[in-house]
Amino acid sequence: MRGRSMFKAAALLALLAQPVWAGAAEDQVLAAVNKARAGAGCAALTMNAKLAAAAHGHAKAMAEQNFFGHASKNGARFSSRIKAQGYRYSKVAENIAAGQSSAAGVMKDWLASAGHRKNILDCALSETGIAVVYQPDDKPLKGQKYAMKYYWVEVFAAP
């Protein structure tokens, strides 16, 4: 009986490893992205599970392996991560961010950056995957004073 209780406790901890707000934050980013796109005359993006898996995998890798960049530690670029999920695309783009504790914060920074804004407002892109991973025991990245703790990834694609 004790073994079963320990298993249940471990399963519960695994479920709680990601904050409850993570899904809500991703939904908030999607809503904000689509609001910005509507203002630019672009169609709304739709969520795609394969793109979301690619985004989550990279956000998780950055958080757990303590790095920040479009290329994974093994050198894989976002296009490779998207292909690995079985998604066939004609065009792709990626936005990453770290340190922002809210959807509003990450959107403010992305929209203030010319390259990130360009990806958000690219009317040729029609699908997206969004992920945020929270690493409570994160360590500061090399050259940084404070830990980022929040790692954001949004991938954009056109099939």
Please annotate each region the language model reported:
Residues 23-65:
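A short alpha-helix/helix-coil micro-patch that ends at or immediately precedes a cysteine
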Residues 50-101, 120-122:
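Short, surface-exposed glycine/acidic/tryptophan-bearing loops
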